[in-house]
């Protein structure tokens, strides 16, 4: 009889151990999608559908959780920097409290329209406002396991006031949405023509080496969200987030626009080969992105205009970001060149990587002279 009780006890212990191992395996290799069983019938959401239902129905995480290794011209980021991020994830993937649950499918504290902060607190003040943010601008919920791991990629140069305003607004929003996130500021070195698309590719490459992100949101520094229901999460299809901007009277300037803020999974970025590296100066890279998205068999999705709303910070034209006079010639060749222009041929030099309290700062040399020399082969009259 005693032997029988002992056998039953051992069997129960074995079953509990198996359950724990299955849970850990699931959390590492396939954290459940927010709404992986939901689908949408159209790539563009219709305005007369209930706004929040439309958001939820178009939210999913379909990419795997494993880090990818892209070929680049710089060595893998040091173990010290990787460890700084990975230490944060250990208690999430292997919690001491095995009863820790995933966060609610709908974040519980969303209110809809929110205050947009236009003041410019200094960095020390911002650190006091957001004390729970980890090194590198890495935030995550404390009382539940985040359902999404999101890297915010911001191309940047010489706009510190805008950066502080954006950080103030984004950290407030992203914490409320219960995301596991970090903000990456990808800063181009001085004395080069600004290249937004290539900075996006570099941001993706650097961020992917630090942490197993599922979703990448490419975000202009001068756009501030006006509604907290605009979820910064992984889309089923690539998503144009900045649908309604005050500068354009909250209307799309044209139907094919894919600029401002875009959200793509790792799988999407692989399929479209990232952004073009060849648009030096203002204009062209966002329309090129729309074309390569279509060529890869994907569609651009949007949330309803009453949710996907943004305020744009006013700014003057920058001397280092002149209008790209060759943009139309390059865009005319996108269908021919997109598979060999992007992540697949990305070349840059990582000058500095710094985990600041509110963001990760990556300073990069985009090797403009070398790239322009190569471009002359395809566009001899432009470069």
From Swiss-Prot:
Residues binding Mn(2+): 222, 315
Glycosylation sites recorded in the entry for this protein: 37, 71, 81, 97, 191
Pathway: Protein modification; protein glycosylation
InterPro entries named in the record: Galactosyl_T, Galactosyl_T_C, Galactosyl_T_N, Nucleotide-diphossugar_trans
Enzyme nomenclature, EC number: 2.4.1.-
Effect of a null allele: Worms exhibit resistance to the Cry5B toxin produced by Bacillus thuringiensis. This is thought to be due to mutants having reduced population of glycolipids which are targeted by the Cry5B protein.
Alphabetical list of Pfam families matching this protein: Glyco_transf_7C (PF02709), Glyco_transf_7N (PF13733)
Disulphide bridges, residue numbers: 103-144, 215-234
Keywords: Disulfide bond, Glycoprotein, Glycosyltransferase, Insecticide resistance, Manganese, Membrane, Metal-binding, Signal-anchor, Transferase, Transmembrane, Transmembrane helix
Membrane-traversing stretches: 7-29
Topology, Cytoplasmic side: 1-6
GO cellular component: Golgi apparatus; membrane
Role description: Catalyzes the transfer of galactose onto proteins or lipids. Required for susceptibility to pore-forming crystal toxins in conjunction with bre-1, bre-2, bre-3 and bre-5.
Protein name in the entry: Beta-1,4-N-acetylgalactosaminyltransferase bre-4
Organism expressing this protein natively: Caenorhabditis elegans
Gene from which this protein is expressed: bre-4
């Amino acid at each position: 009889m005693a032997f029988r009780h002992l056998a039953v006890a051992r069997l129960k212990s074995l079953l509990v151990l198996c359950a724990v191992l299955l849970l850990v395996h699931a959390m590492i290799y396939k954290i459940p999608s927010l709404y992986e069983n939901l689908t949408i019938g159209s790539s563009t959401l219709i305005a007369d559908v209930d706004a929040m239902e439309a958001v939820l129905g178009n939210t999913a995480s379909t990419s795997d959780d494993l880090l990818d290794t892209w070929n680049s011209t710089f060595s893998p980021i040091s173990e010290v920097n990787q460890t700084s991020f990975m230490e944060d994830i250990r208690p999430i993937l292997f919690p001491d409290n095995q009863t820790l649950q995933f966060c609610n499918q709908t974040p519980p504290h969303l209110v809809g329209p929110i205050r947009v902060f236009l003041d410019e607190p200094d960095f020390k003040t911002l650190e006091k406002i957001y004390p729970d943010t980890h090194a590198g601008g890495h935030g995550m919920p404390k009382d539940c396991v985040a359902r999404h791991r999101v890297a915010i990629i911001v191309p940047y140069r010489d706009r510190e006031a805008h950066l502080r305003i954006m950080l103030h607004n984004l950290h407030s929003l992203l914490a409320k949405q219960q995301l596991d996130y970090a903000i990456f500021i990808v800063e181009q070195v001085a004395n080069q023509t600004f290249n937004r698309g290539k900075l996006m590719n570099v941001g993706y490459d650097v961020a992917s080496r630090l942490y197993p992100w599922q979703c990448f949101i490419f975000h202009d520094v001068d756009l501030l969200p006006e509604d907290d229901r605009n979820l910064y999460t992984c889309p089923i299809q690539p998503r144009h987030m900045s649908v309604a901007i005050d500068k354009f009277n909250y209307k799309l300037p044209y139907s094919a626009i894919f600029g401002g803020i875009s959200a793509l999974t790792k799988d999407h970025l692989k399929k479209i080969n990232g952004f073009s590296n060849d648009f030096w100066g203002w204009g062209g890279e966002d329309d090129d992105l729309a074309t390569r998205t279509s060529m890869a068999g994907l569609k651009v999705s949007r949330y309803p205009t009453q949710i996907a709303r943004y305020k744009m910070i006013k700014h003057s034209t920058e001397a280092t970001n002149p209008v790209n006079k060759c943009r139309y010639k390059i865009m005319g060749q996108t269908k021919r060149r997109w598979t060999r222009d992007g992540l697949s041929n990305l070349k840059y030099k990582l000058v500095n990587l710094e985990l600041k309290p509110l963001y990760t700062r990556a300073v990069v040399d985009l090797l403009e002279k070398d790239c322009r020399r190569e471009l002359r082969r395809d566009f001899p009259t432009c470069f």
